């Protein structure tokens, strides 16, 4: 409704009345992000060398990978238009090692879910600098990420970010182990 009233001094007052409902619903877009991070031995190598024992060290590959993941995580978490959740899978492998508990390192345990779904960026950024050791079992990392997809939100867009420095060196046998 709009009204105009003339005042005694020759000026006018204009009144505008607006009616509507108050909406308190959030319109944040849901996003689920899974990072799949290589923690094989070569991730400890300098960025431009194929050996950990090079003369020149311009930063480790794992440091660059961690910084990239942490930067992306913090940027996404700070976006007020997103309702974002994160998960982190790490993978490597070394067929000759025995792990705690007496388990032999086999393809089936070459990956771990380091962080299950969380909306806390700091949980991810505190876990992206794992030790680097063993071979590169892409398959184990991808299978673990696939398992996390079962826990994703149905209404969320999903991104799987795969971070590695090289070709796979281990894989599952034909029987799945």
Each predicted region: which residue ranges?
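Glycine-rich phosphate-binding loop signature in dinucleotide/nucleotide-binding domains
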Residues: 149-156
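Short, charged loop segments at secondary-structure junctions
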Residues: 43, 82, 92-144, 150, ...
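Internal, charge-rich low-complexity segments
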Residues: 46-50, 167-177
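Low-complexity, acidic Ser/Thr/Pro/Gly-rich terminal tails and inter-domain linkers that flank the onset
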Residues: 1-8
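A general secondary-structure signal for short beta-strands and their flanking turns/coil
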Residues: 9-13, 28-30, 135, 155
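Generic helix-packing signal
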Residues: 69-72, 145, 149
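Von Willebrand factor
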Residues: 24-113, 157-164
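Short beta-strand elements of extracellular/lumenal beta-sandwich folds
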Residues: 10-22
